[in-house]
Amino acid sequence: MKNAFLKTQLLPLRPLDESGSQWLKDITEQARKENLESLVSSLSNQGKQINFLNAVMTLSPFLREVLIANPSYLSPLLYVDIETRLSEIIEDITLIDKNKSIHETTLMAALRRKKREAHVLIALADLGGVFTYEISCAWLTRLGEAALGVALRFLLREAHDHGKINLSNREDPEKDCGLIILGMGKFGAGELNYSSDIDLIVFIDEMSPHVGNLSESIDVFSKMVRRLIRIIQERTAEGYVFRLDFRLRPDPGSTPLALPVRTALRYYEGRGQNWERAAMIKARPVAGDKSAGFNFLKELFPYVWRKYLDYAAIADIHSIKRQIHAYKNYDQISAYGHNIKLGRGGIREIEFFVQTQQLIAGGRFPQLRGRQTVAMLAELHRLGWISEKTRDSLVKSYAFLRNVEHRIQMLADEQTHILPIDVSQFTSVAYLMGYQETNSFICDLLKTLQVVEKHYAALFENEQELGLEIGNLVFTGEEDDPETLITLRRLGFERASDICRIMRTLHCGRYKSTQSAEARERLTELTPALLKAFGATKRADEVMLRFDSFLQGLPSGIQLFSLLQSNPSLLDMLVLIMGAAPRLAEIITHKPHVFDGMLDPTIFSELPTKTYLKNRLEYFLEGVISYEEILDHLRVFADEQRFLIGIRILNGAITGKKAGFAFTALADLIIAKTFATVQEEFSRLHGNIKGGRVGILGMGKLGSCELTAGSDVDLILLYEHDEDAEISDGGKPLYIFQYYTRLTQRLVAALSTLTSQGILYAVDLRLRPLGNKGPVAVSFEFFRKYYRKEAWIWEHLALTRARGIAGDLDFLQKLENEVYEIIAFSRNKKDVIKAVCEMHVLIGKGKPPENRWDLKRMPGGIMHLEFIAQFALITHVIVFQIGATTADILTQLPNSFLNQSFISDLHHAYGLYTNLSQIIRLCLNDALDLNNMPPGLSDLLLSSVGEPDLLRVEKLIEETGQLVYSIFKQVMKY
């Protein structure tokens, strides 16, 4: 027969200070109030047991507080051993629901009282050396199961009585109820630690005859689980029973608390992650329909235990290691503040050492399918997988670390695994471990951590590392790994917990891009490089959020992840897009197909000339015949090529001027092909006009080959026909004016209508004769007459940028010849100056600059450069050429017009503005705001102009604007 606990030889503990005697007096006083005379007498005696209690009171604030309030917990220990008393408590718990008058409030109170007593007794037995850590864990697990069981039985009976479910046996409500509760982690393994959460997953056996309508059952059982959480977890005046955690269930962010078995099986077989396989090793039915629970685990068997170790399985297992791996050069093992569970050399590494080898060999060796860590170490040795020395050192280390873990938690009954930084609290842990001074404890602790780390590091010593020794990157389960948070902050992330959540979501397979195991494997391998690259940006969290949005829209991720893994330069480019260019990031988020163009190895070596783009377009449209398909293909092609031109700008492969040529060449091709397609379809329906010819003039920046990303296109559609023509010759004939009006409208719709494949170009027809008051399609005769007799000078200025881009080639030549003749008119220079100045004032009032970075409308900005260039053309300072850019015109200005220094200044200003505006228009949808600038955009802008900071750039822009404006006023004598 075992001795009563308070008469047993207990481990001598060193007290923290001399306060223990006073605390014992407080217990004695409370015991006297409760008439516990035997206990009062015992506490008054001197002896090793009293000295033990004295020390405990100084070392554990939690135990001290509970014992002072509840000295009755000690009374039975005068007569019985702790295990006997614990058995009585467990029995009391299991019988609570037998009381027919029980209700939720009394159940909660009874559970909390019984649990608190058991909790204290287990701690005393553990600290006194009566229990090993294994026995303590077993009792804690039994306590958890008893509490869960009685609470669930109460809820099942209540639901049955209210007609929500139909039990087969009210007296034994768990039997065949169809509700499965699996204990996971340490609870499933029977290794619950002192202040542990209990990890649970709840399933519904939809095949059970007692589960009715599945949708209703999900609702009923999920509500039942919420009440179970309240009964067990909610803190009341009596405390709490256990904290419950249901986040290990499949896709916890989007699934109910109670999940149908078939749904779960589909998830595990199709989207189950590496860590979920490992987690299921310890899964065990702990409450509810246990028979159905064991059947579920049998069905899950092939997912967890793979019979043949193929390459995919090995990669899967390696992926777990990569997700949990603590890199060798990251930090140092320490004592104060070290995480005993998740830190280097900690409990998690021992558990992973075992679980990895279980996953590798458990499919072939049934002996390796056990749940308990120490037992599996023994089996690994027995099968020859590890040496006797490895087994013994890891068993010893595991015991030591579990004991340390328990004592950390006994300080304040908190689920923490971190050794205190506070010297007094750290000393308390050392003394609770039985040490008489801290140095010996620290020495043994560090030695243990180093032993574990050594075995863990050797687990896959020949495996290729991920290549970046940057620290812990653990994104398994639902908890944030403390060392991972440290790593993320070190990399440059401010909201490390949010980044962990994003990475867990990616690894969970909730997005299409990460649903396949192969994609998640590639992502795991890419993660260190990805996070390092994003962390190096100025606002890493914002960049990571954009990347997350991008992946949400990606239909498949494996190709992208593989591409980024094998092409670091592409990863750098993706990071640059996410960090500097919200507009491009938005494009690839909604149209991820544009990123396909990055597969082209010549992307940065070949400039996007018109010939280059024409060849690409012909190849892209090969075999595409129908009207809608051609338009959709054009939209996809335009999106991709605009994106790739933008990438070349970001990369520095092309200047702003060359980008203008490239964007314009693309627009020319797209508009010409769109018009040809529209015209063919229109002719099929309505026929043709006799002698009819159409030509389209590009105006504005399209005409002068200076388009930017996102530019509108200014167009004028002109036509001519035979004099005797009246109506088209098709099945649905139209009169001439109606015909060309509708043709123009069809063209505008084809270019500017937003479809699922995007939009080609926003179209502006306002530069046509009479603007919005005039017809959308203009006859050549009216055009000729208008510009020769009625047009304002500003319309002649605009005509200097006219260029034929689509339609009948002979007619386009005729149109351009007419433009040459109109520009060649003799004009009064003073009238032109007056018109330019009036327009300048009008624009300044109607559309003033938004800020200092409004490079177009600011004083001395792009608009003033264009005024100077257009003025020089229509006053014949230089010879007019169709398609000449503003830069070309400024370069050709003669010294008789401006001195060479001014001409050079204008040309330099245009280059500065063009480079900056191309980048800004590429990266942003809205005007640039220095207070809300994307993190990487400032670096791009600085790089483009060679300045060290944005204040210098602003100063440069301001000085350049002042210079240009002064030249403008000199030219206009204004």
Curated annotation (Swiss-Prot):
Q: Which Pfam families match?
A: GlnD_UR_UTase, GlnE
Give the reactions, separated by semicolons, that this protein catalyses: [glutamine synthetase]-O(4)-(5'-adenylyl)-L-tyrosine + phosphate = [glutamine synthetase]-L-tyrosine + ADP; [glutamine synthetase]-L-tyrosine + ATP = [glutamine synthetase]-O(4)-(5'-adenylyl)-L-tyrosine + diphosphate
Q: Where is this region: Adenylyl transferase?
A: 468-974
Q: Which UniProt keywords apply?
A: ATP-binding, Magnesium, Multifunctional enzyme, Nucleotide-binding, Nucleotidyltransferase, Transferase
Enzyme Commission code(s) on record: 2.7.7.89, 2.7.7.42
InterPro entries assigned: GlnE, GlnE_rpt_dom, NT_sf, PII_UdlTrfase/GS_AdlTrfase
One MF term in the entry's GO annotations: [glutamine synthetase]-adenylyl-L-tyrosine phosphorylase activity
Q: What class of enzyme is it?
A: transferase
Where does the source fall among the domains of life? Bacteria
Co-factor requirement: Mg(2+)
Region annotated Adenylyl removase, chain positions:
1-464
Cellular component per GO? Answer: cytosol
Q: Which GO terms describe its biological process?
A: regulation of glutamine family amino acid metabolic process
Function summary: Involved in the regulation of glutamine synthetase GlnA, a key enzyme in the process to assimilate ammonia. When cellular nitrogen levels are high, the C-terminal adenylyl transferase (AT) inactivates GlnA by covalent transfer of an adenylyl group from ATP to specific tyrosine residue of GlnA, thus reducing its activity. Conversely, when nitrogen levels are low, the N-terminal adenylyl removase (AR) activates GlnA by removing the adenylyl group by phosphorolysis, increasing its activity.
Similarity comment: family membership: Belongs to the GlnE family.
PANTHER family attached here? BIFUNCTIONAL GLUTAMINE SYNTHETASE ADENYLYLTRANSFERASE_ADENYLYL-REMOVING ENZYME (PTHR30621:SF0), GLUTAMINE SYNTHETASE ADENYLYLTRANSFERASE (PTHR30621)
**Which named protein is this?**
Bifunctional glutamine synthetase adenylyltransferase/adenylyl-removing enzyme
